[in-house]
Amino acid sequence: MPKLTHFDDNGNPNMVDVSQKETTVRIAEASGYVYMEKATLNTVLNKEISKGDVFQIAKISGIMASKQTSSIIPLCHPIIIDKVTLEILPDLDKSRVFITSSVTCRGATGVEMEALTAVSVAALTIYDMCLSLIHI
């Protein structure tokens, strides 16, 4: 079984040492879906949510979150991000929204967590902004 790199031989958590790794361009992509009622999705698409343009705010929140990943994932390295993009595409047939992110940096460690964080927070933002339309 492979050894978990975030724990020492005694089982204590530690941040992985990447100081000897070569600096290279790193790119990661992530994606996810938010499912909702068709009426809710139509309200979002018609920009009838009083809080604002759901997709634009979700993109901004995803970008902001990707830059804060090391603050919320304890053993994630703080990195300098060169680029973050988010795309949000509605799928009316399946009553869902497809979210993708792409994150780029030049560094010694990857940006997978930043890409996943961007999608996760964008999805949470979409859900939060639609809460007033959701009947639980």
Language model features with spans:
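Post-transcriptional modification and biogenesis factors for structured RNAs
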Residues: 103
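Short Gly/Pro-enriched loop/turn and capping motifs at secondary-structure junctions
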Residues: 106
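Conserved catalytic cysteine-centered active-site region
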Residues: 123
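Glycine-rich active-site/cofactor-binding loop and its immediate structural neighborhood
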Residues: 100
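N-terminal, polar/charged subdomain of small-to-medium soluble alpha/beta proteins
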Residues: 1-95, 109, 116-118, 131
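Conserved small/polar residues in nucleotide/adenosyl-binding loops
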Residues: 134-136
